[in-house]
Amino acid sequence: MTTIKRRMRVTRLYTGADQQSHFEDLEIEMDDLGLIGHLSARHPVTSLIFRHTDADYDYSWHNAPQRQYIVILEGSLDVEIGDGTHRVFGAGDIMLAEDLTGQGHISRAVDGQPRRSLFITLD
């Protein structure tokens, strides 16, 4: 039997040597475990935060308060970094926020819609 590797995309937001935030696309490998599906290795976490963000959310330059995964459940999140690049994260998308220092990023609601998300802290 051939095992099929699956991958799940995570977008990393981190501070580069230039003290600017950057995006990096990562792929988390998952192993085929048959009937239960594909699973990744365990990733240690410290807490889970449930969050609702209002439709007018517009948070100017800031850094992530700690290393954390942000999982979008409903709605969308627009993240802008220093070079003007925007990425929009929608339901099912995962971001690993690690830009703890430097200029940081801007976060905004998309299309005047509220957002529900999970913050899964790592530190």
Language-model features: locations:
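Short acidic-glycine-tyrosine-enriched beta hairpin
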Residues: 52-53, 82-100
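A short beta-strand-loop-beta hairpin characteristic of the jelly-roll/cupin
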Residues: 58, 63-64, 69-90
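A short hydrophobic beta-strand segment most commonly corresponding to one strand
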Residues: 95-100, 110-123
